[in-house]
Amino acid sequence: MGVDVSMTTSIEPAEDLSVLSGLTEITRFAGVGTAVSASSYSQSEVLDILDVEDPKIRSVFLNSAIDRRFLTLPPESPGGGRVSEPQGDLLDKHKELAVDMGCRALEACLKSAGATLSDLRHLCCVTSTGFLTPGLSALIIRELGIDPHCSRSDIVGMGCNAGLNALNVVAGWSAAHPGELGVVLCSEACSAAYALDGTMRTAVVNSLFGDGSAALAVISGDGRVPGPRVLKFASYIITDALDAMRYDWDRDQDRFSFFLDPQIPYVVGAHAEIVADRLLSGTGLRRSDIGHWLVHSGGKKVIDSVVVNLGLSRHDVRHTTGVLRDYGNLSSGSFLFSYERLAEEGVTRPGDYGVLMTMGPGSTIEMALIQW
């Protein structure tokens, strides 16, 4: 014999979503810092310097929603114009810029966190604009005189989404080492990853990327840290679009060259809901509960597609579009430039939720849920 009981269930956000991560210690953001290369140029200035006259290519640059980018342009040739640097010179450029910008971003980040180099216990470096062995982490440790006992990791070649992959790694390290400071450092010398062949394919890439480095300090087990805590990650690789974004060897150009399929903004947008729904699954949260969206500044069309498919407002992505306008696409560290702007804005309140979103080769979408 049974009794039927009428029940009404109301799903509310969990008071402490840290249980979702399965971690006994929750990682919090402790500080952020950014750096760029020495010189910036408007899109018109780049076109004039590179002597680009093709109206279609000029239109790509001038309709990119980018005002300025920090770039280290090719050297001038004796007869005027610019020299197309060989791959060896580009690798040297990457090493010099990535280390310089990375050191400055790291120092700014530690200052923001109220910490010093001697407090650093784990350094995870991210780059895709060049290849280094020993890795960028080793070079920066030597350059800044960081304790050689500092543990380190390098994420290389994952592209624009890699900053969140690194945060996932360092958040796990942080939870296992409460009270110790870890840093995610993204350093991308996009000026070292170009090809000049007059085609529309390379024009799109050359119009988009800029040099930049961003560092994020994290720590667990210290409730005094005011930054948001990391609650959950979600990842999705669109295997049918594996070749839609890639950085590989161009035999005709005798160098590495980046390829972006024209359909990639729509591919990313069409799959954004899948990842967002997985991220919020089991939390009791809806997308409308998210107060702050920090999306990778991948390009005007990519941002527009994400906005439409996730039902966001232009205000939601104001930092994303602002970073694109002022810097261009900074690859793996773009979302941290946006986070820095949000932190400086001072509008977050305790209990607010935020979503970090990056997109890159694979084609890949990464997301993280955070709470202040």
From Swiss-Prot:
Top enzyme class: transferase
Impact reported for residue 296 to A: Reduces the formation of DPA-CoA
Active site: 160
Catalytic activity: 4 malonyl-CoA + 4 H(+) = (3,5-dihydroxyphenyl)acetyl-CoA + 4 CO2 + 3 CoA + H2O
Superkingdom of origin: Bacteria
Keywords assigned: Antibiotic biosynthesis, Transferase
Knocked-out gene: effects: Cells lacking this gene are unable to produce balhimycin.
Entry's Gene Ontology molecular function annotations: acyltransferase activity, transferring groups other than amino-acyl groups
Enzyme Commission number(s) from the entry: 2.3.1.246
Effect of residue 190 to A: Produces DPA-CoA at the same level as the wild-type
Pfam families registered for this protein in UniProt: Chal_sti_synt_C, Chal_sti_synt_N
Pathway: Antibiotic biosynthesis
UniProt effect for mutating residue 160 to A: Reduces the formation of DPA-CoA. Strong decrease of the affinity for malonyl-CoA
Gene Ontology biological process terms from the UniProt entry: antibiotic biosynthetic process; polyketide biosynthetic process
Function per UniProt: Involved in the biosynthesis of the nonproteinogenic amino acid monomer (S)-3,5-dihydroxyphenylglycine (Dpg) responsible of the production of balhimycin antibiotic. Catalyzes the Claisen condensation of four molecules of malonyl-CoA to yield 3,5-dihydroxyphenylacetyl-CoA (DPA-CoA) and three free coenzyme A (CoA). DpgA requires the presence of the dehydratases DpgB and DpgD to facilitate the aromatization of the DPA-S-DgpA or DPA-S-CoA intermediate.
NCBIfam families: DHPHCoAsyn_DpgA
PANTHER family, per the entry: HYDROXYMETHYLGLUTARYL-COA SYNTHASE, TYPE III POLYKETIDE SYNTHASE A
Family note: Belongs to the thiolase-like superfamily. Chalcone/stilbene synthases family.
Protein name: 3,5-dihydroxyphenylacetyl-CoA synthase
